[in-house]
Structure formats: C-alpha cells, structure tokens
Amino acid sequence: MVSVSEIRKAQRAEGPATILAIGTANPANCVEQSTYPDFYFRITNSEHKTELKQKFQRMCDKSMINRRYMYLTEEILKENPSVCEYMAPSLDARQDMVVVEVPRLGKEAAVKAIKEWGQPKSKITHLIFCTTSGVDMPGADYQLTKLLGLRPYVKRYMMYQQGCFAGGTVLRLAKDLAENNKGARVLVVCSEVTAVTFRGPSDTHLDSLVGQALFGDGAAALIVGSDPIPEIEKPIFEMVWTAQTIAPDSEGAIDGHLREAGLTFHLLKDVPAIVSKNIDKALVEAFQPLGISDYNSIFWIAHPGGPAILDQVEQKLALKPEKMKATREVLSEYGNMSSACVLFILDEMRRKSIQNGLKTTGEGLEWGVLFGFGPGLTIETVVLHSVAI
C-alpha cells in the first residue's frame, strides 16, 4: 500500500518554477504620445475645453511615454460615440469589443510563447488568464482554450478585475502550480485592452484624465514549469520566492469600479509616496534570507504605474538610474498596460541582456526582484534568479 506522503512526494516537482518562454503582442494601431492630446480632445468633441487640454498636454509631456498601442481606432470611436462621452452609459458597447479582443490579443502572445518554448501545445497542463478588461462567462480563459485548440481538460484559472499588481499575481500562482504538480507546464496570459477605460475628459475628475494619458493595450504570455527538459527547454528566469501584501493605511489609494459607463479608475496623488514608503519592508522580507541588502546589486522589474512611482522608489532606495532601464523602456514604448507590463519588462530584460553580451538573463546579475503595484494598495513581490546565457 502506498502512503499519502509517498503520493505527495511523487506529485511534486524537484526544482523551482522556471520561466521557459515569453511572447508579447499589441494591436496594430500605434498612437504617438506627442500628438495624442489633439486626437483625444477632437474625437471626444472636447476641443472647446482649452484649459483642460493644456493640462492634459502637460500630463502627456511628463508621462515619459513616447507611444502606446490601442485597439480603439478613430473609426471604432466614431461608431461608438457613447464611449467618447464622459460617464455616458456605454458598458454594452465596451463589452462587445473586449470579450472578443482580449482573448484574440492573448492568443497572439500565446502563439509566440509556445513557438519559443518549442514543445507541442498538447503538453500544456494549466492555463492562467488575467485581464482587467471586461467580464464574461464562460471567460476569456475558455475562449483562449478554443482559439489555441488546447485540450479540453487543461486546468483553467480565470482572474478578472485584479488591476496593475496582477502581473505579479500570475507569477505567484504559476509558481505554486508548477512546483506542486510534477511535469506541469503552465501557460500564463495577461491581456489588457483600454476599451473599458477610455472616455472623454472632465474638469472635475483629473484622476480619470491621468489614466487617459498613461494606459495602453498589450498582451503577454509565458510558459512556466519546473525541472526543464535538458537540451529541449531553455530556462529564462527561475522564480524563487513570492509574497503579496496590502500596504497599511492605503485604502482608497487606487480604486476601480465597473459601472454602466465602463471601468472607472480613481487614483490618489499620494500613490507614489505609499509605494516608496512600503518598498523597503518588502525588499528586506524578500532578500534578508539571501544576505542581500544592496539593492543596486540586483536587477529590477517594477510595474511602471507612472514615472512618479519609479522616481520615488529610485530616490528612496538610492538606486542607480540604470536599475530601472528596462522598466522605463517598456513604459516609454508601450505605456501602462496594467497586468501585462511586468511580463513585457521580463522580455525586454532578457533580450537586451543577450544583445549586450551579458553573462545572465538578468543584466549580468544573479538575483532580481519583480514588483506589482495596484488596487488595495496591493504589492506583489517576486524574487527571481537569472540564468546563464
């Protein structure tokens, strides 16, 4: 007779969860940040609000974003005037867009990740799908399973309405699945489309305008598994430790509410201060067991909620400017893509590390950290170990 402990041991992997492939995708429509205020105020019939437009222009200029990608084209917005009006009932129109586009964009990223992984999709055992863009039943996880032709008994996890910290959440969940299910190969997909949050400007709600200056569309996909098959699977990063915490005294700092007018976001001005105030504690908890206290000696992947958050974290920890290079590059080229952002940064970092002839996937360094920040205010922490190139 086999004991429970023997069964448990046989079910578990030996090594740490490892990222084995990364794929990303964006809509074809590219929006230049320098000309976006003109487009935005024209398409929302708000050109008469000249002072507000000047404020928005300053927001865009300070955003450190060069371009973003958006599913919403001028043609689509002209066909859906309720989406352009501030707080007009428009949820049906938005839902009709995102329930199709979110899994479609997710598929595009997933196909790239599966191709890089180099294994048949029949070997995928689990699927984690994450989006803050719309809600549906059966969910985007089901739609993606159909679009990719995955096996019907793939174990699916659908995460709706998590917000910007969720790039860390999917890694935490994927780590637990991979390490506790021997031979598991987890497809992780974050797909975000701003059709739920786009709306015209309001003089009385400038936090809504901040979102219009920052958010962009994108999808990222990973394959995660433990005990990579030698010569066949190529590890990129190992996930060593994860944590999630709610920052004290932060209630209401970041809120999102799904209403008839779509998804409304509310941000307090002190969000960057709350993040920078709590980041030291998160780092000590993560790196003290490794004997690391010099945070310039590790590589950095932080959700780029906006330039102010990155600036204050750098200042608080006395980080060298190059520490946030990959993070700022993704913010500059894509904007804030909510949950997908940190996965784009993982891809950017490993690509640049290879291009620059560095020793590891983590900018030549051994250890690194990935942070997600979002509603709550919730902080996700992932300790990463790089792989030799």
Swiss-Prot record:
Q: Please give the SUPFAM superfamilies that the UniProt record associates with this protein.
A: Thiolase-like (SSF53901)
PANTHER family documented for this protein: CHALCONE SYNTHASE 7, HYDROXYMETHYLGLUTARYL-COA SYNTHASE
User: Which protein family is named in the record?
Assistant: Belongs to the thiolase-like superfamily. Chalcone/stilbene synthases family.
Q: What does this protein do?
A: The primary product of this enzyme is 4,2',4',6'-tetrahydroxychalcone (also termed naringenin-chalcone or chalcone) which can under specific conditions spontaneously isomerize into naringenin.
Give the species: Pisum sativum (Garden pea)
Output the GO biological process annotations, alphabetical, semicolon-separated. Answer: flavonoid biosynthetic process; polyketide biosynthetic process
Listed A to Z, the keywords are: Acyltransferase, Flavonoid biosynthesis, Transferase
Q: Name one Pfam family in it.
A: Chal_sti_synt_C
Please write the reaction equations for the catalytic activity of this protein: (E)-4-coumaroyl-CoA + 3 malonyl-CoA + 3 H(+) = 2',4,4',6'-tetrahydroxychalcone + 3 CO2 + 4 CoA
Q: Name one GO molecular function term.
A: naringenin-chalcone synthase activity
Pathways per UniProt: Secondary metabolite biosynthesis; flavonoid biosynthesis
EC class (word): transferase
| Listed name of the protein | Chalcone synthase 5
Its taxonomic placement starts with: Eukaryota, Viridiplantae, Streptophyta, Embryophyta, Tracheophyta
Active-site residue list? 164
EC number(s) reported in the record: 2.3.1.74
